[in-house]
């Protein structure tokens, strides 16, 4: 069991913040290219979706969507940075732990959406796109950045 006393919380928070921003940018870029661009929708449609989902469709503001999405991404980034700091096995294997972490994030966020009353109408292609987005374009970059930041 890892001890909390010897942890460098400032470094974990900064590392998680940067990793979360990187993951947030990459997952947004991938989801936009895969889901919104083919339908000729602007990138703001992605963030409108986030804000509408988070507020129960009471507010649909793209800037609120960006803020919410990056706050959540940063929180997940800090979560990974903490896990990597306390579990060397996670930190040493970013190409395994990153996609697994992305899968965990995806599953938990699907439950969050269900709890918020959002109907998830994913086709098989949509599901695979969201799975790929979370595992490869979110979890993996967070893990790779965290691995390199811990070595520095």
Residues of each region from the PLM?
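Membrane-interface interhelical connector segments
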Residues: 37-58
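Hydrophobic cores of alpha-helical transmembrane segments in multi-pass inner/ER membrane proteins
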Residues: 75, 133-147
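Mid-bilayer segments of alpha-helical transmembrane spans in multi-pass integral membrane proteins
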Residues: 102-112
């Amino acid at each position: 069991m890892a001890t909390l006393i010897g942890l460098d919380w400032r470094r974990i928070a900064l590392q998680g913040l940067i990793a979360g921003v990187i993951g947030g940018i990459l997952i947004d870029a991938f989801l936009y290219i895969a889901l919104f661009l083919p339908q000729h929708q602007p990138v703001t449609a992605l963030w409108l979706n986030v804000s509408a989902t988070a507020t129960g469709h009471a507010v649909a503001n793209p800037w609120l969507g960006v803020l919410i999405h990056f706050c959540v991404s940063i929180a997940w980034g800090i979560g990974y940075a903490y896990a990597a700091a306390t579990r060397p096995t996670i930190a040493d294997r970013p190409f395994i732990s990153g996609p697994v972490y992305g899968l965990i994030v995806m599953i938990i966020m699907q439950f969050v959406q269900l709890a918020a009353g959002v109907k998830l109408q994913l086709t098989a292609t949509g599901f695979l796109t969201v799975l790929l987005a979370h595992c490869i374009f979110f979890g993996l970059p967070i893990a790779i950045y965290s691995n390199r930041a811990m070595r520095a």
